[in-house]
UniProtKB/Swiss-Prot annotation:
Family of this protein: Belongs to the Cu-Zn superoxide dismutase family.
Entry protein name: Superoxide dismutase [Cu-Zn]
Purpose: Destroys radicals which are normally produced within the cells and which are toxic to biological systems.
Cofactor entry: Cu cation; Zn(2+)
Record note on cofactor: Binds 1 copper ion per subunit. Binds 1 zinc ion per subunit.
Amino acid sequence: MXKAVAVLTGSEGVXGTIFFTQ
């Protein structure tokens, strides 16, 4: 799940990194 969220928000970059850490 986390990975999926990181990829989806990867467009923003910053949000993707934060979600990936969570």
